[in-house]
Amino acid sequence: MLDAHQLHVFLAAAETLNFSLAAKRLHMTQPSVSQHVQTLEQHFNTPLFLRSGRHVELTDAGQALLPLSREMVSLSVRIDETMRSLKGDVCGHLLVGCSTTPGKYIVPHLLAEFLRMHPHVQASCYVMARQNALQLLSKGDVHLALASARDFSRDFEFHKFLSDAIALIVPLNHPWASRDGIDPEELLDANFILREEGCGTYNAVRDGLLGVGISMDQLRTALTLGNSEAIALAVQEGIGVAFVSEMVVTRLVKDSVALVQVRGLDLSQDIYIGRHIHRPATAAQNAFWEYVTTTNNRPLRELEKTPLEA
């Protein structure tokens, strides 16, 4: 008879395509993993893996079993967590996918208090591009996603829970550093360090500049970088000026760059939490969702203060 543990072992082996890595993930020995896989193969009377030396790949039968195993293991986890929750415990493993700024500056702040409130919950946070986080949410590889834009799929529910201010920063020796503010058209005279197209910060800056009659193509781009921290440090080194999340500024370069007000330009990006509405949620997932979306969440209210004034 099948049991959830056997399928859990198969799932680890199928996802890693390496019995040794699967053993490390499960805190088992490699021979034990092999034995569980062989037991499953005997049960179904068909091979689940093709083995060639150290190379392993799934057979057609293994490919067919993979999504069913995910469902079975997930159901087993939910059963265990549900029964434990009847005793009042919020427990289980929480998987969160995050785009860059939420993952580095928001989620750790939220999880710190949430895990103190619910010590039987384990959490894993994966920081990646926004679209990748949403893809993992769609596939069920993470329970929740935090990102700077919503996906309008009918399969998802999104809730805005934070607004992240975006500031223009310049090197301390830049002519703008000593001024009270600049007019939008003066931006065309600067060398900019920009994020890549498609990220949340880029989109927020693009939309804001269009509101004052400036397109991104009009900006003089000195450098394009893949994360806000690198951009802030590049500004500190005098390479150019940049629009960056104030959370990044206050935690990384607050005293090493100058903030410049652009008249008529107020930039921010909304941060959302999303979940898949067709997948049953565990007690831990529901608790974290309620914790993030509640209006009196103290850590969120602290984050919503202008970081450079806090």
What are the language-model segments listed below?
Residues 129-134, 138-142, 147-148, 201, ...:
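Hydrophobic hinge/microswitch elements
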Residues 11-29:
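Short helix-boundary/capping micro-motifs
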Residues 154-160, 164, 179, 229-278:
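Beta-alpha-beta core module
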Residues 106, 259-302, 309:
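A late-sequence structural motif
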Residues 176, 192-213, 281-285, 289, ...:
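Secondary-structure junction motif
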